[in-house]
């Protein structure tokens, strides 16, 4: 039985205040041990640009409607004949007081395919977290 799903996608990154997009890799990960989370590592030319942990249900909802407040916001967008998931990520504060910002566009069909694979590992509504293990981990890091 698979307990993990990994997939690498080419996505479009729009960084800063420009409308220009450029391709980067998004390495998606899902582990049954952390059933609510999706991990995304963005890289370009072999260099890690950022690592984010996203809520699986939020990503699913973001395919059909705008969701999120704070650091992560998702919404569906159409670009010509393509349907995309727009992921806005807000980072640390810059010297001028604004926050670092990146927008990533992912082909909707690729996200849906990845989510289907995660659902075959842990079905939505069947997620479980062992509280005792979680508390033991927290106190060990203490």
Cite the ranges covered by each PLM segment.
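Protein-protein interaction regions
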Residues: 19, 66, 71, 76, ...
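Short, surface-exposed beta-strand/loop "edge" segments at domain boundaries and coil↔beta transitions
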Residues: 19-21, 44-54, 94-103
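Short, well-ordered loop/turn elements at secondary-structure boundaries
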Residues: 34-36, 81, 99
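Short alpha-helical interface patches
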Residues: 37-47, 56-67, 112-116
């Amino acid at each position: 039985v698979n307990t993990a799903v990994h997939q690498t996608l080419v996505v479009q990154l729009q960084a800063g205040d420009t409308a220009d997009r450029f391709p980067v890799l998004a390495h998606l990960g899902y582990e049954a041990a952390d059933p609510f989370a999706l991990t995304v590592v963005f890289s370009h030319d072999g260099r890690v640009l950022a690592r984010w942990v996203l809520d699986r249900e939020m990503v699913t909802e973001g395919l059909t409607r705008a969701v999120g407040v704070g650091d992560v916001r998702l919404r569906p967008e159409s670009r010509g004949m393509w349907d995309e998931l727009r992921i806005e990520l807000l980072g640390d504060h810059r010297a001028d007081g604004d926050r670092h910002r990146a927008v990533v566009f992912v082909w909707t069909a690729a996200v849906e395919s990845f989510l289907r694979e995660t659902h075959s590992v842990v079905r939505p509504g069947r997620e479980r977290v062992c509280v005792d293990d979680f508390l033991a981990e927290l106190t060990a890091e203490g």
